[in-house]
């Protein structure tokens, strides 16, 4: 099920489509709260994919065979490519995912596997190197961590995938860390990130 939400949050109209990939699990997610502050500043037309509601499936042998058959025919209209088409056509992308086990929730990896469709979001040169086909010029990655945000196996992976495989030239990390460590005020740390977004980002 493709979750779509369209909004106009900015006083200045923009025609760009911003895709919000929401990998947050909790209803009161701090990561989502920060991401929505960013979306409010970006404005324009927005579509949201709530990964927890997508029932994403791993790429089994049967699904891989089916996908290969379709891509070899150049048939990208099949419903199994709906999320990939949406990702490819977005002008700007915001991914929100908490920092879990030095990385991010498994559902985000499932999403990336499902949208990485050769011929749609990426292709390969004669030398075997990926060449991105995505329209987006920038990808934002929003995350929060209960402790220190190290090592970086989440944004670093997303950044490399975006630039080297999807053809998205610019990426930016927004993070709040130490949220569950005694002596740190989680609300203040989240509020500080939101204030930074409101002061620095605007169209």
Kindly label every feature range from the protein language model.
Residues 49, 142, 174:
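Hydrophobic residues at beta-strand termini and immediately following loops
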Residues 117-127:
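Conserved nucleotide-sugar donor-interacting segment of glycosyltransferase catalytic cores
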Residues 152, 157-203:
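Glycine-rich phosphate/pyrophosphate-binding loop and the adjoining helix
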